[in-house]
Amino acid sequence: MKHQKRVLKFNRSGSHRDAMVKNMMIALILNHIIKTTLSKAKILRQFIEPVITRAKINTIANRRLIFAKIRNTDSVIKLFTQIGPHFYDRPGGYTRILKCGFRKGDNAPMAYIELVDRSKLVIKS
């Protein structure tokens, strides 16, 4: 009997879960929108929001902390040059989850997770 579910396991090991979240973070930073299952989108939101908050202040320490989580130089550069300055005045809530039906094979609920005001972000870049 699991009273408080602290971690959704997704039937994966811990390292596989971490790699999955890291890959989804990189994809969201580079593409501004991704399609995934609803539960994965909710987990991704928990991890990406603090990263974007830290990317609003461009210091070497923040760059190193984010690089330690993401381990992708292209996404770190994009975070600090485009996404961080774009969300500088916003106190939080950088992502939006939009439900988009069910997957054909297993009827899993699907969702788009996107950065808020992504059209303005794409025009700048």
From Swiss-Prot:
<dbReference type="InterPro" id="IPR036373">
    <property type="entry name" value="Ribosomal_bL17_sf"/>
</dbReference>
<dbReference type="GO" id="GO:0022625">
    <property type="term" value="C:cytosolic large ribosomal subunit"/>
</dbReference>
<dbReference type="GO" id="GO:0003735">
    <property type="term" value="F:structural constituent of ribosome"/>
</dbReference>
<dbReference type="GO" id="GO:0006412">
    <property type="term" value="P:translation"/>
</dbReference>
<dbReference type="InterPro" id="IPR000456">
    <property type="entry name" value="Ribosomal_bL17"/>
</dbReference>
<dbReference type="Pfam" id="PF01196">
    <property type="entry name" value="Ribosomal_L17"/>
</dbReference>
<protein>
    <recommendedName>
        <fullName>Large ribosomal subunit protein bL17</fullName>
    </recommendedName>
</protein>
<keyword id="KW-0687">Ribonucleoprotein</keyword>
<keyword id="KW-0689">Ribosomal protein</keyword>
<dbReference type="InterPro" id="IPR047859">
    <property type="entry name" value="Ribosomal_bL17_CS"/>
</dbReference>
<comment type="similarity">
    <text>Belongs to the bacterial ribosomal protein bL17 family.</text>
</comment>
<comment type="subunit">
    <text>Part of the 50S ribosomal subunit. Contacts protein L32.</text>
</comment>
